Amino acid sequence: MKSKANFQLTSFRTPYHLRNPHSQSIYAGIFLKGESVKYRRERLVTPDEDFFDVDIVDGRGPVVIACHGFEGSSNSTHITRLMTLIQKLGWSGYAINYRSCSGEINNTFYTYNAGKTEDLEQLI
């Protein structure tokens, strides 16, 4: 693992067979499988008397917050793969499930979108 002192940011280099960003997304969705992650779930109550769930892997190192995409959840392939790596590193990971994305319908008509960050702000 690199420390902050010797960390260097490098440019992303696409694989030769996935030059198009759309093909990268499609490939991941079809060919990559999710990992099995043992989460601990916490429910956070929001100021508007609704809720969202956060699935957690406990560790001792840095904390990573993972945000799923549209109609995703903490069980999305990219999230479970990330959380598996976080777990192996001994870090803590918080996978937020935006409203109505944890398998339970919420109490209010409010749903999430990328422009609404109040739930993420509450988690942080």
Show the residue positions of the predicted features.
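Hydrophobic/aromatic beta-strand patches that form the interior of the parallel beta-sheet core
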Residues: 42, 65, 94-96
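N-terminal cap/lid segment of alpha/beta-hydrolase-fold proteins
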Residues: 21-58
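Catalytic nucleophile-loop/oxyanion-hole region of alpha/beta-hydrolase
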Residues: 99-124
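Short beta-strand element of the alpha/beta-hydrolase
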Residues: 61-69
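Short strand->helix junction
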Residues: 71-73
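Conserved alpha/beta-hydrolase
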Residues: 75, 83-107
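N-terminal presequences and immediately downstream first alpha-helices
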Residues: 1-32
